[in-house]
């Protein structure tokens, strides 16, 4: 058995798996895939899940608008009070939910940065149910890293990355971090 007093923590090793141009290409492809799957932008609503899903939804909406020549409704969906770990962390400050009009009979695309366990998306489904009855709900993520705990799959994926449980996949966005990148950091401990 290891002695925590004498064990030194494993150093963190980080590597970039996608740079700014690769992130841009992935988002452009995702925008086209969303348009193809929906047969255009009609009735499409993109809802970003904070934090990084919000700027991703804005970017996808701008890319779709560039192709279609008309604006796409987009907003943000806070899931704070729908998370299944509230008992572990009961003090939470709900964020902002901004829905661009009714979502009834719309095709709602939930947008997030990384799909991992599926729990964030499960909470988003619960939050969405309280807001209306969309015709369909789709999921678009920049990164799918596997290791699901819930039976959830993304409809549109920018990049699939195989990562071990002791690795953290992080998305950096210019709006929040000053640059666009996808990194993997080995933490030395299982999540």
Residue ranges and their predicted role:
Residues 1-191:
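PRPP-associated nucleotide enzymes
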